[in-house]
From Swiss-Prot:
InterPro entries: ACT-like_dom_sf (IPR045865), ACT_dom (IPR002912), ACT_ThrD-II-like (IPR044561), Ser/Thr_Dehydratase (IPR050147), Ser/Thr_deHydtase_PyrdxlP-BS (IPR000634), Thr_deHydtase_catblc (IPR005789), TrpB-like_PALP (IPR001926), TrpB-like_PALP_sf (IPR036052). The keyword Amino-acid biosynthesis applies. It comes from Thermotoga maritima (strain ATCC 43589 / DSM 3109 / JCM 10099 / NBRC 100826 / MSB8). Pathway: Amino-acid biosynthesis; L-isoleucine biosynthesis; 2-oxobutanoate from L-threonine: step 1/1. The modification N6-(pyridoxal phosphate)lysine is found at K51. This is L-threonine ammonia-lyase.
Length: 401
């Protein structure tokens, strides 16, 4: 088992290597939840996530002979970059097996850190099996993403920093995939103050740790794709499972919409960029946990989110909150008809983002044109006002988003 001394040793090992990330007070989250909320900003860590802590601590404990053989790992992103950077610092070869679906940006970043990247399999499990075959063939040391004592101790330094920076913290909320992060953090927290409540958060689409705890042993779940791909682990480790069972007080799961809303909330309200896995703790305090009157630290585990994904989340969030709307209607196919429609929209204070004019669709009567408007609006009441006024003026209106 991992001890507090193991984590303190890891902290000494990591000194001057990793960033001691800020534990930042969030006034907006505190106001919304009624708690006193602090964010542990591992999204600002080297490589954009906490993974460098465990990877570096693991490699630091290898013998010279083991380092000469190099290291191998399997990852879809964050662990890959953590291992690649740690290997680069030590000047040893690293081979990273990534699934073919891994984002191109993460593949490129891993290669730029000097690692040899091999794309193998369509899912993480297939990449993992390929990495084990490489280990067996080459003799390289396998750096497990979570089920390893030195990796867990490295991640546990986050717990030490939280306790040092906020000694009277009452609740610590941590994302959970394979369990390496929360295992280390919970050992550190509970060893220093057993009264602090440690809560883990998974996604409803991949609740492997929650399912395992219910069944009493580490078990595999098939799950579904999730925005929180960084914690999409089908089976927790045997070691991490035992540590979570011993030290973690509660586990909750959040759904995809709650994760997307949390990403947008952090971006817009707190000015924090978080990936899906990094945002699940915030999703939990916004939707699942009562933290009113409590002093709470939430680990923002990473910020490696694809720009295209941010764009989709923002647009969906704008539609959901009534700040963007898509309207379909019909106008007479004559000069000035479109201008008249747009004039009404302008008078109502909506900004036209795009217009699509269609005479040819089979549902369009002869002599008419179908108009699709993308509008920037204030809120849902504004959308309702636009719909009401257009209907009153004789337009057939359909809100499509």
């Amino acid at each position: 088992m991992i001890t507090l001394e193991d984590i303190k040793e890891a902290q000494r090992t990591l000194k001057n290597v990793v960033h001691r990330t800020a534990l930042a007070y969030s006034s907006v989250l505190s106001e919304v939840t009624g708690g006193e909320i602090y964010l542990k900003m591992e999204n600002l860590q080297k490589t954009g996530s906490f993974k460098i802590r465990g990877a570096y601590n693991k490699i630091a404990h290898l013998s010279e002979e083991e380092r000469k053989r190099g290291v191998v790992a399997a990852s879809a992103g964050n662990h890959a970059q953590g291992v690649a950077l740690a290997a680069q610092i030590f000047g040893i070869p690293a081979t990273i097996v990534m699934p073919r679906y891994a984002p191109l940006s993460k593949i490129t970043k891993t290669r730029n850190l000097g690692a040899q990247v091999i794309l193998e399999g369509n899912i993480f499990d297939e990449a993992y099996e390929a990495a084990l075959r490489i280990q067996e063939k080459t003799g390289a040391v396998f750096v497990h993403p979570f089920n390893d004592p030195h990796v867990i101790a490295g991640q546990g330094t986050i717990g030490l920093e939280i306790m040092e920076d906020l000694p009277d913290v009452e609740v610590v909320v941590v994302p959970v995939g394979g369990g390496g992060l929360i295992s280390g953090v919970s050992v550190a927290i509970k060893s220093m103050n057993p009264e602090v409540k440690v809560i883990g958060v998974q996604t409803e689409n991949m609740p492997s740790m929650i399912a395992s705890l219910r069944r009493g042993r580490a078990e595999r779940v098939e799950g579904k794709p999730t925005l929180a791909d960084g914690i999409a682990v089908k089976k927790p480790g045997d070691l991490t499972f035992e540590l979570v069972k011993k030290y973690v007080d509660e586990m909750v799961a959040v759904n995809e919409e709650e994760i997307a809303d949390a990403i947008l909330f952090l971006l817009e309200q707190a000015k924090v960029v978080a990936e899906g896995a990094g945002a699940v703790g915030v999703a939990a305090v916004l939707n699942k946990l009562d933290v009113k009157g409590k002093k709470v630290a939430i680990v923002i585990s990473g910020g490696n989110i694809d720009v295209n994904m941010i764009d989709r989340i923002i647009n969906k969030g704008l539609v959901k909150s009534g700040r963007k709307v898509f309207i379909e209607t019909f106008v007479m196919d004559r000069p000035g008809a479109l201008k008249e429609l747009l004039g009404i929209v302008a008078e109502l204070g909506a900004n036209v983002l795009s217009v699509f004019h269609n005479r040819s669709a089979k549902e369009v009567p002869i002599g008419f044109a179908k108009i699709e408007l993308e509008l920037e609006t204030v809120d849902e009441k504004h959308v309702e006002e636009i719909e009401r006024v257009l209907i009153a003026k004789g337009y057939e209106v359909r809100i499509v988003g």
